[in-house]
């Protein structure tokens, strides 16, 4: 909404500052963080009061979690989504369609996760919505978003897969891109969901990825920088940097309460929404493959589950002591802080590797 203050810049020249995406991105970071900092305690108290026993802990998971995690409320994603939405609505250009498409995916996935968390808490079981039903809803949301993105672009690039490291190598998938893009968004959402198993493990890599895609969005949406870096220019996507800033700020606020020992878990409400948001931004700015690099930690977690399940069904043997892979290291004797901080380091390295694709052509 503050973007509209530009209309008064002729009378108040200071309002010209709202033209700049960088300034509004910074404002979104601060707004998202302050909102969660200030409202977080109230939200946590209300969730704890309503949930009683908190998030149910899996009996077949690490036994230490039955003691250290029991009674902690979930649905903390509500804090993140609230801060993210307030920061976005306040600082983003309300006339930019990319903003609303990505925000719709984020809140849509958040609603699916919220209902899943609600089912788990009320029934005190780790089984929420059936996997098939959840995936169908996620694919419907993601497919609609990808259709809108292709229609919005109305050009060959909008339906193409861009190959990093090469100057002008693109694969035009036509309308099949809608299917591909939906898989990217749904895959990202569920990969982040699988990563969210230890205090602070998911939110920091999400913030790292958000900061990275904030930079990518700004560069892709700027014709001058895009030409200099020889990357594909997508008009209007620079505004997505503001959303990334709002997510970064809200994530910082949430980490304050999610730092071990966590006062609250983000739950599926947060993890599905944030993963879906990263996936939809990657699709919008034509950096789907780069997402697999920057979000490589999430890919690793998801692949570890796929490999574990496939191996057990085919051979009756497990590759890992427990999946996702962060539980494997728990079973090997690594402490929770060791796993979390080491995975953060991996996330930083992967983000730098992903950002390097912008220059290596």
From Swiss-Prot:
Keywords: Cell cycle, Cell division, Cell inner membrane, Cell membrane, Cell shape, Cell wall biogenesis/degradation, Magnesium, Membrane, Metal-binding, Peptidoglycan synthesis, Transferase, Transmembrane, Transmembrane helix. CDD domains: GT_MraY. Its main location: membrane. Pfam families: Glycos_transf_4, MraY_sig1. Pathway: Cell wall biogenesis; peptidoglycan biosynthesis. GO terms for cellular component: plasma membrane. The chain crosses the membrane at residues 25-45, 72-92, 95-115, 135-155, 169-189, 200-220, 240-260, 264-284, 289-309, 338-358. Catalyzes the initial step of the lipid cycle reactions in the biosynthesis of the cell wall peptidoglycan: transfers peptidoglycan precursor phospho-MurNAc-pentapeptide from UDP-MurNAc-pentapeptide onto the lipid carrier undecaprenyl phosphate, yielding undecaprenyl-pyrophosphoryl-MurNAc-pentapeptide, known as lipid I. This is Phospho-N-acetylmuramoyl-pentapeptide-transferase. The lineage of its organism: Bacteria, Pseudomonadati, Pseudomonadota, Alphaproteobacteria, Hyphomicrobiales.
